[in-house]
Swiss-Prot record:
Localization (cell): Membrane
UniProt: heme binding residues: 444
Free-text function comment from the UniProt entry: Cytochrome P450 monooxygenase; part of the gene cluster that mediates the biosynthesis of pleuromutilin, a tricyclic diterpene showing antibacterial properties. The geranylgeranyl diphosphate (GGPP) synthase ple4 catalyzes the first step in pleuromutilin biosynthesis. GGPP is then substrate of the premutilin synthase (PS) ple3 to yield premutilin. Premutilin synthase is a bifunctional enzyme composed of the fusion of a class II diterpene cyclase (DTC) and a class I diterpene synthase (DTS), with the corresponding domains and active sites containing characteristic aspartate-rich motifs.
Protein name: Cytochrome P450 monooxygenase ple1
Superkingdom of this protein's organism: Eukaryota
Species for this entry: Rhodocybe pseudopiperita
UniProt-annotated glycosylation sites, renumbered to this chain: 141
């Protein structure tokens, strides 16, 4: 007997009933769990009028105290923005729930207009990002130091000579050191000690890029439809900015890669990330696609490390000038270990006080005060708070670094906070390294490389130089202003100081350091 119409309809009705029940349960959960606290929202625009235009990390930290919560939420034209003001909250969500919190928000300015969409560190979570990360990790693996440590030693020695010859250009030399080391490791290219075109290109690019990557810097990121407005219409300055950035992106991605390819073809090259990757491409089934991917990853390495590492090293110099008693203690430790020779990577564990100084550098002035934004790919509930799917999530590294529960008197520069009374590392104190380089699956892939360069440079400089406050025409010391260029990446502005060899023996070591050197080759 054929089933009746009612019998045929029953399975369909059951499916729809199940779907309806699922939606009802989901809606009840959302009603039960409210959003994290934050300023009162206006209809449609939300908190657009409340969002700080600059130094937003301090505002968000203050709001957290006002609402007695280490997680707060605001909205901008329908977009949920969640700020995590404690390391515990960041680890709970970005690390332990990384399956939900590992994507990146889409930026119309960055991903569509500026030409910088190739930067895999800012890509959404997915295969393209994983491929970029794998390529980087394969070459810059911290367990294979023999590849890159000799280059760090080479360029740090040149850095010492640069400081000796032109002591008034500290931050220029810092950028040259980091940029040169990165270029050598990535492309096998050598740079000039002064006014190198590749280093200058990175400097121009990162200044412009840091602006477009700053949250809320351009209205087109809040109202994406504005991208269709012609460039000649008043109020569309983002088009001019994007055009400038496209030029930078092209040269950063293409120019050093082209030179590296030409060197490799002649056989006169130093092994590098690019040379190793090009050799791997010989067996590729999709060589053209993989070649473009390689350019993307190399360009990312070239620009990313050059700015963040230089910022931290610049802060180290500023701190040593501002806090001479810290400098002297570090020098005493170095003298007891080195006995007049230059430091090497194997010496790092013998420098507990210097290691504490570098930890305090990371904490005192975070390089990325708001971190790099994450984005949720699903609804979540945390401490009875509903965090909507698609929320942009910031780890407020500045708030974490100034958390009095972890770091009493956070305004003080005090390396001793990381040491026990007998001068050994105090593992009970949260290591700022675990904050400074991000969280979860999106943690900075180059963190160990950056830390190695910073530590070697800091140890080498303090073993040979005194970093002193500048003096005016009356011989009175000039206190550095401690001002920073504030954007997504915070970097110290130029500050007056004096740099001089500690003694005659130190000067002899410095004078022997080369400004140029014979390039090792693949042969």
């Amino acid at each position: 007997m054929a089933p009746s119409n009612t019998e045929r309809a029953l399975p369909v009705l059951a499916i729809w009933a199940a779907i309806g029940l699922a939606y009802w349960i989901d809606s009840q959960k959302k009603k039960k769990h409210h959003l994290p606290p934050g300023p009162k929202k206006l209809p449609i625009i939300g908190n657009v009028m409340d969002l700080p235009a600059k130094i937003e990390w301090e505002t968000y930290a203050r709001w957290g105290k006002e609402y007695n919560s280490d997680i707060i939420q605001v909205s901008a034209v329908g977009t949920s923005i969640v700020i995590l003001n404690s390391a515990n909250a960041a680890n709970d969500l970005l690390l332990k729930r990384s399956a939900i919190y590992s994507s990146r928000p889409h930026s119309t300015m960055h991903h569509e207009l500026s030409g910088w969409g190739f930067t895999w560190a800012l890509m959404p979570y997915g295969e393209s990002w994983r491929a970029g990360r794998r390529s980087f990790t394969k070459h810059f693996n911290s367990s294979n130091p023999g590849i890159n440590q000799p280059r760090e030693l080479r360029y740090v020695k040149r850095f010492l000579k640069q400081l000796y010859e032109k002591p008034n250009d500290v931050l220029d030399h810092v950028r040259n050191l980091v940029g040169s080391t990165t270029l050598s490791m990535t492309y096998g290219l050598e740079t000039e000690p002064y006014n190198d075109p590749y280093v200058e290109l990175v400097e121009k690019a990162v200044l412009a890029a840091s602006e477009i990557m700053t949250s809320g810097a351009f209205l087109v990121d809040i109202i994406p439809a504005m991208k269709h407005i012609p460039p000649w219409v008043p109020g569309t300055i983002f088009h001019q900015k994007a055009a400038l950035m496209r030029g930078h992106a092209y040269y950063v991605r293409e120019q050093p890669f082209k030179v590296a390819q030409e060197m490799i073809k002649t056989g006169d090259y130093e092994p590098s990330f690019v040379s190793d990757a090009l050799r791997d491409l010989e067996n590729s089934e999709t060589p053209e696609e993989d070649l473009e991917h390689l350019k993307d990853v190399a360009g990312q390495v070239y620009i990313a490390g050059a700015d963040t590492t230089a910022s931290a090293l610049g802060t180290f110099f500023l701190a040593m000038v501002c806090f001479p008693e810290v400098q002297k203690k570090a020098q005493q430790e170095l003298d007891s270990v080195l006995n007049g020779r230059l430091p090497e990577h194997a010496d790092f564990p013998s420098f507990p006080y210097l290691n504490a100084v570098i930890k305090e550098v990371y904490r005192w002035r975070p390089v990325t005060p708001m971190g790099v934004p994450h984005q949720t790919i699903a609804d979540d509930v945390y401490r009875d708070y509903h965090i909507p799917k698609g929320s942009i999530v910031f780890a407020n590294q500045w708030a974490m670094s100034n958390d009095e529960n972890d770091y009493p008197q956070p305004g003080e520069f005090r390396p001793e906070r990381y040491l026990t009374e007998d001068g050994k590392p105090n593992k009970a104190v949260r290591d700022p390294f675990d904050i400074a380089f991000g969280f979860g699956r999106r943690i900075c892939a180059g963190r160990y490389l950056a830390h190695s360069t910073i530590t070697l440079a800091a140890a080498s400089v303090l073993s040979l130089f005194d970093l002193l406050k500048a003096v005016d025409e009356n011989g009175k010391e000039i206190e550095p202003t401690r001002e920073y260029h504030q954007a997504m990446i915070s970097r110290p502005l130029e500050f007056p100081c004096r740099i001089k060899p500690r003694n005659k023996e130190a000067e002899e070591v410095i004078r022997a350091c080369p400004l140029t050197f014979t390039k090792p080759t693949s042969a």
